[in-house]
């Protein structure tokens, strides 16, 4: 590939961790002023490569060469790479909630004179940077008081304060709603017009096709190919083939639903905000699930989807929760997570790293976490049985790891999600609530998760799926509820459903399905 204005070149980068070679002779070239996408399945090495580039993994811990602006770079830490203008924004945002926007922007790079912070300059400069990223909030606003979309923009403003030449964004839209995602992509295109170079890691191939000039595919720690997207001739299927090493003919596995009787009814469900009890989050929601059925819940960010799920699952979120839960025709009382588990409910959280896993513990202990009583005799865990169950799930769920003694924090996102699912399946539930089950997961791992969901339904379990990706809901669900401002505003069958109808219900403008008042 001819690159007369090559800003970055990474040559033969190899990086190993105990028991695994994460990168194997990877090559990457990025042109000045382009948006370059980096794609690949979870565990392909994308984030590891960017951590090598940015100095998170210092020179000496990897093999190969980094050339930036024609110079060989041997970064000892992230500060050295930032001094040259290479700035990375990680998937997990690093803002301090208790500090203001301005303080976060200049954290570690304070606007000081003679060792004393100049607050007037801090606020003034922060306001200029916020304007550049299109954020109108006051620089004095605490980071905890702005949404995740705005927090992402603050991270970019922070990068701009460091005189960025190469901006690296790792899954920048993974936690954003559609509107915030579009705003961020437009901002990247605006930066490109100004001559800035960006590298974007994303599983959202439609977004990559929209903004990127070139994309490099990684697979199993190796660079497979670099494609030009400027012609518009590279299809998503072509990219997926490069990522997984084969044609993925269908995004969703085939399925013949076998739907049984109603297993769960949620009647007149109300939930108040725990921080503002005078504000209702969920308002008179009614829904039902049948055995063997996959039911979707669609809604924009803030619609109340997660609040609904968590309040049903043992009142684990919300205040003054009221309404009726009926399972198999009988009312059940669920006052705690333990009650929920005892009644056959399971909840896979949208935030696996914070609430779904103990990252510093091994796979075996994470899988057995909700089933210790079941695995115990006289109050003592049967270690042999625990190992057998974990090993069975490792094979059944295709968790890619050399050992169940591996720390869960070392796994890729897709494999972590399989551990969370294994944990809840082992508990033996009749009803599973899956909140964003494939967030931040590549297409290959998504297919495997979809297969697991199909298998659960085939076993007669009811599955409630919450997802921000409408194609996912349309591909998985037998029925879909739409939620808007805490109310169910519509219900559509698989045959009736399409993105347009769902969006109408999600924004309360009606559609052709069954309107719910």
From Swiss-Prot:
Domain ABC transporter intervals: 8-245, 264-510
EC number(s) stated in the UniProt entry for this protein: 7.5.2.12
A Pfam family per the record: ABC_tran
Recorded GO MF terms: ABC-type L-arabinose transporter activity; ATP binding; ATP hydrolysis activity
Binding site for ATP 2: 309-316
Topology term for the membrane: Peripheral membrane protein
Primary enzyme class: translocase
Gene3D superfamilies according to UniProt: P-loop containing nucleotide triphosphate hydrolases (3.40.50.300)
Entry keyword set: ATP-binding, Cell membrane, Membrane, Nucleotide-binding, Repeat, Sugar transport, Translocase, Transport
Binding-site list for ATP 1: 40-47
Compartment list: Cell membrane
GO cellular component, one term: plasma membrane
Catalysis performed (reactions): L-arabinose(out) + ATP + H2O = L-arabinose(in) + ADP + phosphate + H(+)
NCBIfam families in the record: GguA
Protein family per UniProt: Belongs to the ABC transporter superfamily.
Function statement: Part of the binding-protein-dependent transport system for L-arabinose. Probably responsible for energy coupling to the transport system.
UniProt-recorded name of the protein: L-arabinose transport ATP-binding protein AraG
Lineage summary: Bacteria, Bacillati, Bacillota, Bacilli, Bacillales
Gene behind this protein: araG
